[in-house]
Amino acid sequence: MSRVGKLPITIPEGVKVGLNDLEVKISGPKGELSKTFKGNIAIIMEENKLVVKPLAVNKNARAMWGTARSIICNMITGVKEGFKLKLEINGVGYRAMVKGKYLNLMLAKSHNTKIEIPSNIKIDLPKQNIILLEGIDKEKLGQFASIIIKQRPPEPYKGKGIKFENKFIQRKEGKKN
């Protein structure tokens, strides 16, 4: 029995949920999200709650049970409140700029890195070394953040690179003579 999957999802005020077989459409004050689920699960609306139930007893149905419930819960939170991620850029001369629909990163390479900003993600740069990402889709926001971090992941000796704000980087000692 899935500990996550068996919990019902309460639908808050201001959020509308539409069900069509395994397609879930959720709209709220921040926007609209839709997702089609695959697998042996059933999504049922009871009063002001959504319930996800497995249709079979096999391993795939049990795996999708908790996953589908978590994804739907994240969709509801996204359209109601939204998600925010904060990235830090550490290093001399490392900085970020937004030009049009591109994020321009200067990361001590022979060229500047340009990354196209997805349409449903907003970027704010309070400082040159801090990137604030905001969006309603938690999955796409995390994927975009990982694309940015992949350009220059933090290294353990000097701590240079791009990382999540609250992530601790285990530092290593350099060579000794």
Swiss-Prot record:
Function: This protein binds to the 23S rRNA, and is important in its secondary structure. It is located near the subunit interface in the base of the L7/L12 stalk, and near the tRNA binding site of the peptidyltransferase center.
Species of origin: Rickettsia prowazekii (strain Madrid E)
Gene3D superfamilies reported for this sequence: Ribosomal protein L6, alpha-beta domain (3.90.930.12)
UniProt KW keywords: Ribonucleoprotein, Ribosomal protein, RNA-binding, rRNA-binding
GO cellular component: ribonucleoprotein complex; ribosome
GO MF assignments: rRNA binding; structural constituent of ribosome
Gene: rplF
Assembly mode: Part of the 50S ribosomal subunit.
GO annotation, biological process: cytoplasmic translation
Family affiliation: Belongs to the universal ribosomal protein uL6 family.
Name of the molecule in the record: Large ribosomal subunit protein uL6
PANTHER family for this protein: 60S/50S RIBOSOMAL PROTEIN L6/L9, LARGE RIBOSOMAL SUBUNIT PROTEIN UL6M
Domain of life of the source: Bacteria
